[in-house]
Amino acid sequence: MSELNTAHPVSYFNLHAEGCGYLNRVRIVQPEKGSPYVACTIAAKHGDTANPSTTKFDCRVSGVRAQAIVQQLEAAVNAEKRVFIGFRIGDFMPELFVYQNGVRKGETGVVNNGRLLQVTFAKVDGQAFELPPEEGVAAEATATLPL
């Protein structure tokens, strides 16, 4: 009987995508139930560099360092500057939706939802953006946690 109550370690398979693309629509999402969170859209580039294709990811920003970086870049995104980032996204899944307005009104579209785990580099209008050091962000996050 005691064997049934023995704790077994839980393990997971992780699915991550790494790439680069343009950061858009940085926002705070306030769900009806639950805590607010930072979200963004990434227009990921892939294929031939002369004529790349784009895949959009709608992300909840999950990594502590990623949250700090995205919030620092929010002003540049809102000023319609071109913010190009390197990223790692996890737990992404496609989701269908119906366009509510515009030329594609009534058509079915697909959005890839995921969690933005890491920002590896950033450029604003082609200029390198200095990312905060990893240990500094983790220390700040720990210092601001309620006791």
Residue spans for each PLM region:
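Single-stranded nucleic acid-binding surfaces, predominantly the OB-fold ssDNA-binding core
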Residues: 1-147
